[in-house]
């Protein structure tokens, strides 16, 4: 097999890169370890920045998103008996976010790829990357017991935190930055109307809570829990009771409860690896960085990586400026670290940490009061929440 760009991973970042390249006439093949149903079964993020919405539109996969996505012009933070709304649209110069689940984004991209006939190999086992620093890298993998080889010009590693792509870079070439948080999020998905038309983030003495949504009829709620907690110890009734206890009373009274479609506990981590490239291998998305979900940045950072890599590949193929690809990591990391900072900050001011003393607790409350009581503070939150601009590539 032969292609121009080999893409490892058929999650949203790999599929989005593949679709953009296909529309630009650049041949690509995607290799995915799992089945399509497994990929679609992942319950993930649902808040899309303006930049990602624009990128999906550019890729020609925005029809269902335009119809079913919920445009949010604001977000609310509740703390210390107060509720403060942040007017995202006014404070960011007209930008908004769109609530549209990652599962739906993935489905749209899968259908678009199938319709255009581009190659995706699912259940590709024993994937290995070779000659990454040479002129002609290649990928080997197994499919139905047969060992196959895929020759290419470049490899995009879009296979997530546990994927083979980052593992294919010599450890001594990488610098890892990481913070693991001492709690997780217990999330519940239910076919109940959302308690609010905008997201509500709550800082409460019992711990953080988030009221989110996937559609006008499907809600997603989260509560902060210790890492020692097990999902099976949380009945639906226990979850709803705990959620209500952490929300402002007027919100809790309106909460519509119902049977859970899914419950899971996600640990929280900040993680960045530098550099994000090695020879002709380029890491994108969770393969290179993880953010705690508090800032809704994970999927959106993957999209900005994809945008950067796509535009650099266009320069390489259309203008013969392959040397620009050497700037990929530096361009991406400038935006990534700003999103890491915002996600860390949101996590720090909204959660209860097990070692927090009275002084730290008062500082946390004052931090929220300052940012939410100041036009400059509100604007800072808003511009980060809707997404910082993508860097132009000359």
Curated annotation (Swiss-Prot):
Pathway: Aromatic compound metabolism; benzoate degradation via hydroxylation; 3,4-dihydroxybenzoate from benzoate: step 2/2. The keyword Mitochondrion does not apply. GO terms for biological process: benzoate catabolic process via hydroxylation. Gene3D superfamilies: D-Amino Acid Oxidase, subunit A, domain 2, FAD/NAD(P)-binding domain. SUPFAM superfamilies: FAD-linked reductases, C-terminal domain, FAD/NAD(P)-binding domain. Substrate binds at residues 201, 212-214, 222, 293. Its cofactor is FAD. Keywords: Aromatic hydrocarbons catabolism, FAD, Flavoprotein, Monooxygenase, NADP, Oxidoreductase. It holds the Pfam family FAD_binding_3. Catalyzes the incorporation of an atom of dioxygen into p-hydroxybenzoate (p-OHB) to form 3,4-dihydroxybenzoate (3,4DOHB). The reaction occurs in two parts: reduction of the flavin adenine dinucleotide (FAD) in the enzyme by reduced nicotinamide adenine dinucleotide phosphate (NADPH) in response to binding p-hydroxybenzoate to the enzyme and oxidation of reduced FAD with oxygen to form a hydroperoxide, which then oxygenates p-hydroxybenzoate. Homodimer. Belongs to the aromatic-ring hydroxylase family. This is p-hydroxybenzoate hydroxylase. The lineage of its organism: Bacteria, Pseudomonadati, Pseudomonadota, Gammaproteobacteria, Pseudomonadales.
